[in-house]
């Protein structure tokens, strides 16, 4: 999340989404930083090098209402003013109320510290999936579910909930892209005949948006990947909006992702070395 508080409250803004602080999230090609020798000049390398450059497609939501921005900024400040003994940013989530001029509904902003808050984010997402009655729509490039989340997905499918996912199975260009691609293919292999999985296609662009919509009335816009790393290791944040009117505003955006994607074949090929590697639970939990 990015929050800026201006002297004139009308100019204050908060932006919530999955965008990282990296040139590839803002520019279409590497920026020449040779004039600044202390800055890292990103290259075109692949693998585990941090000196890599990729173009990313992301999605954010901007808030301009002064009261909402101040509430979100105050919640973000708890990360910097977190408890020294437990490392917790309290509380896990807070309500955000509109000013009445906007569509009626309920919104909650959350910040997770999974290694200290008892995996509260994982429990939250499990509850959301368990609450789904007929339809879950997802945009997310990372598909390595935790065991508890996988069980929730299985329960949803068993009770007839339709699940549609726009992802990016081939994550070439991402750091560790070959490993992440293999994990995504394992997800396709397991769920491809039960979940409508599509691959976002855009030349030289890696999908990075994280959107989840449930039953045409709940929308989650966040930094949360559907993988072990987000639920077990990384701090994440996002906004949950329970409002059919907001879903109606988001639906064309989701439809645009669908329009720029293709169905994923279920007969994926996964090298045996990756199968052996990810048979180990502790390895999967690292991703």
Q: Locations of the language-model features?
A:
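Charged, low-complexity intrinsically disordered terminal segments
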Residues: 1-287
């Amino acid at each position: 999340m990015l929050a800026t508080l201006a002297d004139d409250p009308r100019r204050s803004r908060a932006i919530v989404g999955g965008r990282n602080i990296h040139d590839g999230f803002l520019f279409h090609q590497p920026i020449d930083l040779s004039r600044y020798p202390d800055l890292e000049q990103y290259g075109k390398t692949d693998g585990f090098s941090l000196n890599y450059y990729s173009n990313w497609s992301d999605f954010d939501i901007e808030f301009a209402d002064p009261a909402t921005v101040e509430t979100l900024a105050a919640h973000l400040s708890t990360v910097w003013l977190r408890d020294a003994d437990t490392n917790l940013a309290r509380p896990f989530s807070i309500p955000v109320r509109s000013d009445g001029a906007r569509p009626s509904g309920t919104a909650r902003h959350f910040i997770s510290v999974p290694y200290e808050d008892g995996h509260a984010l994982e429990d939250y997402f499990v509850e959301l999936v368990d609450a789904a009655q007929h339809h879950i729509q997802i945009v997310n490039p990372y598909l390595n579910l935790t065991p508890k989340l996988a069980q929730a997905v299985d329960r949803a499918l068993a009770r007839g909930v339709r699940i549609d996912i726009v992802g990016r199975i081939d994550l070439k260009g991402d750091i560790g892209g070959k490993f992440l691609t293999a994990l995504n293919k394992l997800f396709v292999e397991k769920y491809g005949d039960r979940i409508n999985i599509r691959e976002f296609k855009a030349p030289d662009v890696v999908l990075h948006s994280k959107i989840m919509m449930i039953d045409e009335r709940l929308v989650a816009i966040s930094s949360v990947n559907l993988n072990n790393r987000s639920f077990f290791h990384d701090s994440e944040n996002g906004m949950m909006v329970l409002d059919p009117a907001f879903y109606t505003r988001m639906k064309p955006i989701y439809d645009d992702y669908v329009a720029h994607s293709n169905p994923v074949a279920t007969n994926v090929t996964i090298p045996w070395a990756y199968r052996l590697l990810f048979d180990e639970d502790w390895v999967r939990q690292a991703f």
